[in-house]
Design a protein with these regions (language model features):
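Short histidine-centered beta-strand/loop micro-motifs
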Residues: 31-38, 78-80, 97-100, 127
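Aromatic/histidine-rich interaction motifs
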Residues: 100-112
Length: 176
């Protein structure tokens, strides 16, 4: 059996001649991934825990059973709260039909299972066999997934932005 794709970096695998690279990563609680971007598109899925994702378009709070679609080249910062990810990194040409903005999507039981399976594949999986079929089905499921309104656009005004950011940190605090 091949080594599974766990706790490795997309940077080491970006050039693999496959449309999809799937990687699973276990993060310590409260781990912050500083702002970064990828050449490939990313579907960021937390099998456990909650992710706080920040982009120029706004902030998303992403519970389990949800994933974040991050288009190619879009900078994102992620706070991991008890998260074990199963991410797929996709060649831009394979997902031209997807939205050019970040989205939170619903992950069906089938898609969840495909994501869990994908990280167990060899990096250079057999495109003509079962593994290739699994990846193709994952892409089909991604294209028909439902977008969810968990997006909080943030105001550009610095004073208002400050208030909103405080509120996001402590949503139960009433600001008078």
């Amino acid at each position: 059996s091949s080594p599974s794709m766990r706790n490795t970096s997309i940077d080491l695998l970006d050039a693999i001649p496959r449309a999809v690279v799937a990687i699973g990563t276990d993060y310590p609680h409260g781990h912050l991934l500083p702002s970064h971007h990828h050449r490939r598109a990313q579907l960021l899925y937390g099998a456990t825990g909650v992710m706080h994702v920040r982009t120029e378009d706004g902030n998303w709070v992403v519970p389990p059973q949800r994933a974040v679609w991050i288009p190619p080249g879009v900078a994102h910062e992620v706070l991991m709260l008890g998260v074990s990810t199963r991410s797929v990194y996709i060649e831009p040409a394979a997902v031209t039909a997807m939205d050019a903005r970040c989205q939170v999507i619903s992950v069906s039981p089938l898609m969840r299972q495909l994501l869990l399976e994908a990280v167990e594949l060899a990096p250079e999986y057999d495109e003509a066999g079962r593994d290739g079929a699994l990846i193709n089905l994952l892409l089909h499921e991604l294209l028909r997934s439902t977008h969810l309104p968990l997006h909080l656009p943030l105001p550009k005004d610095p004073r208002l932005l400050g208030l909103c950011q405080e509120f996001l940190k402590r949503p139960n605090a009433h600001v008078s």
